[in-house]
Curated annotation (Swiss-Prot):
Catalysed reactions, as listed in the record: tRNA(His) + L-histidine + ATP = L-histidyl-tRNA(His) + AMP + diphosphate + H(+)
Species assigned in the record: Ruegeria sp. (strain TM1040) (Silicibacter sp.)
Subcellular location: Cytoplasm
Stated name of the protein: Histidine--tRNA ligase
Family the UniProt entry places it in: Belongs to the class-II aminoacyl-tRNA synthetase family.
Record CDD domains: HisRS-like_core, HisRS_anticodon
EC number(s) stated in the UniProt entry for this protein: 6.1.1.21
Keywords: Aminoacyl-tRNA synthetase, ATP-binding, Cytoplasm, Ligase, Nucleotide-binding, Protein biosynthesis
Record bears the keyword ATP-binding: yes
NCBIfam families (UniProt xref): hisS
One BP annotation, GO: histidyl-tRNA aminoacylation
Amino acid sequence: MAKAKKQPRPKAITPKGFRDYFGEEVTQRTHMLATIAEVYHHYGFEALESSAVETVEALGKFLPDVDRPNEGVFAWQEAEDDGKGDWMALRYDLTAPLARVYAQHRNDLPSPYRRYAMGPVWRNEKPGPGRFRQFYQCDADTVGTASMAADAEICMMLSDTLEKVGIPRGDYLVRVNNRKVLNGVLEAMGLLEDDPKRDDVLRTIDKFDKVGESGVRELLGKGRLDASGAYIDGVGLEDHQAEPVLAFLTSKGDTVTETMTNLRAAVGDSKVGQEGIAELELMGSLFAAAGYGEDRILIDPSIVRGLGYYTGPVFEAELTFEIFDEKGRKRQFGSVAGGGRYDGLVKRFTGQEVPAVGLSIGVDRLLAALREKGRLAATPTGPVVVTVMDRDRMADYQAMVAELRQAGIRAEVYLGNPKNFGNQLKYADKRHSPIAVIEGGDEKDRGVVQIKDLILGAKIAESATLEEWKERPSQFEVPRTELVAKVREILVSQSSDREG
């Protein structure tokens, strides 16, 4: 009789571009999301939770990779017997689902509709160091008003959010630009809306932060050699045609007034360009009136990312402190959030233009920034562990842990094999437990428990002298009736030591 073929065991590995998150990271992210939600709620925004799956039709062409519509997402087609054979996809951001939600429920929603949303998004793109296919976003949007006060409010809320999560003033800057100003520049160049060179110019402008003014000048003209030595063809503009773009990119002055003067020169007589400048001036006045100075929010025409997507103001939150990259070189941390006005997104569903403005915070990048600066909370304290000295007295240990929990103290009974007491303490150490509670048969007969301060014990083991150990022992005996009070007292003392 032939042997049955042995089935290979599945490999226990995460898919490429994905990762697992454990206790401390999850706790830190949960805390950050709650802090951000508190700011959004304070501004009057309401929470929205939409499906992680949308139809590809609903997502439309506002995909991560605009040059490859329907690429860059995790998509599949429903079977005909399950539905209509529709293509479905995991959401790649939180904005496209909002457009669908607003179009579907607009008759029941207040106008303007102010919502915030938080959660994972998925992008089927090539992963890299620190770049994953699943990551968290935290958005807030106002749909249904064209007022620049909405745009200004979003920028101010972003500033408040960064400070609330632990980025102090001086370590960040919210920079603001306007797509209409760029449209005015394109008009001043003689490039009308149907001119194919407009997209080439936009792509070139997007490289400004990488190649600088001289690089953009070359790419707008005949072309340039990149760092690898390869030649990149240029847009083919004459020098005089390229000047308005260069004037636009370098128009930031020492004051807002100077910047606006430079922008007016760049857009010339363009009506849409002048409209964009007026919007920036209005936003600037609103920032000033609310007490948000240029050390927090700054009008800056050099912000060009996303200008192909947005229809009006666009902004980016940049962290200005320096970090060391993987090669030990100093660099600025860079952008952690962005947003702007996108008046065309809902129109795909309704046929009518619906004004909207919003922001999106990259939660994982913001967490990485706080971790880099040592501004995240230390490793969270684990539960108090009630050890098991006699497996036949589990009811006694459960009674202890129940008392601790009823007093609001996080606690658990050791549920592994209690035979080796040392393994119980190793378990408590791995859980970052602050205290272990011990009650053997002798303690039970005498009506006492042993309490072991694991935090103090670790410190003593590292550096304390014999005299210090005698003066402040890490393990002591208390009456069983005082268990809760003594545990609480030690936890308060440990908390004070951490804060001190």
